[in-house]
């Protein structure tokens, strides 16, 4: 039986992870749950899965949780703060850590899991977007293992030869017969919206993803295709891919989750219903397979599968992310931080949808970027970029 810590248990990925556990009670045991401030959901999870530990972001939330659990006779020990989250990621009895805390808050707990030599089920994009080389070097040094949870990266992982799977981030794609990686994306809810109408799109419209059920921040990132840009950066690190070895395709149906092109003309693809439980279950059970709870793909009900190249005028955030990778880790860190602020401002109706890309670019142009040599350096770049972004939002929304 595999013992799990789930970082970000009350979020979308965390809840889907627990659903896979629910379908496979004899295969997985939840040792620790870590979350932000959603006390009610954490209480439900603790009462159902009886983890040894539960960690909340702050003492107030932890106290509320403690009272709720005591009322139900739960023996789960309640802790709070980032240090406690890092300790849960490095517990001796835990072998697998689901890293699903969104944003920069997930960096240190994920790094703690890596340094403890765990198998990390990586759903936190920011880990590689902001700390790609630092994290990949630490994975090798600590003999940890990264398994990608993102549906696209998981699809690529499944389509790669074992020689690359077992040397992720360092294997030479060309020497293993790989020509290129094809990263697919739906194009989001505004794929066919006239360009002149994009400025008027509302947060609720942006969050109506045509295929996937996701949180509001990542739904907006899908609408701008910043999500695909961050995935591009992540894929470059995970698969040791050069720019010429990466292709990005719009695939509106979200049936083919990504592909790998080989030197002999073969293309291997991973297909499935758009359900995050599939890649989650794959990483949890790898190299074996377990039931995910997802519906099987019915080929007889499929419509045509279509593909097109991305329009960078429609999706400037995608191009911005690709260019940031070439500038270095400081640029990708600053872009990610700025985007979190601008998306939050859009969701709060402080700026227009079309302002997101322009503000992100403005932050990059206003920063003197020095390459980070440590996680502390990364966090400093992150903090500065957020402050610059906040000032840009205030200036624009006056």
From Swiss-Prot:
EC number: 1.1.1.267
GO biological process: isopentenyl diphosphate biosynthetic process, methylerythritol 4-phosphate pathway involved in terpenoid biosynthetic process
Binding positions (1-deoxy-D-xylulose 5-phosphate): 125, 151-152, 186, 209, 222, 227-228, 231
Cofactors that this protein relies on: Mg(2+); Mn(2+)
UniProt pathway: Isoprenoid biosynthesis; isopentenyl diphosphate biosynthesis via DXP pathway; isopentenyl diphosphate from 1-deoxy-D-xylulose 5-phosphate: step 1/6
Source organism, top-level taxon: Bacteria
Entry GO MF terms: 1-deoxy-D-xylulose-5-phosphate reductoisomerase activity; manganese ion binding; NADPH binding
List of residues binding Mn(2+): 150, 152, 231
Reactions catalysed according to its record: 2-C-methyl-D-erythritol 4-phosphate + NADP(+) = 1-deoxy-D-xylulose 5-phosphate + NADPH + H(+)
Keyword annotations from UniProtKB, A to Z: Isoprene biosynthesis, Manganese, Metal-binding, NADP, Oxidoreductase
Binding residues annotated for NADPH, in chain numbering: 10-13, 36-38, 124, 126, 215
Its biological purpose: Catalyzes the NADPH-dependent rearrangement and reduction of 1-deoxy-D-xylulose-5-phosphate (DXP) to 2-C-methyl-D-erythritol 4-phosphate (MEP).
Assembly mode: Homodimer.
Record-linked PANTHER family: 1-DEOXY-D-XYLULOSE 5-PHOSPHATE REDUCTOISOMERASE (PTHR30525), 1-DEOXY-D-XYLULOSE 5-PHOSPHATE REDUCTOISOMERASE, CHLOROPLASTIC (PTHR30525:SF0)
Family to which this protein belongs: Belongs to the DXR family.
Name this protein carries in UniProt: 1-deoxy-D-xylulose 5-phosphate reductoisomerase
UniProt gene name: dxr
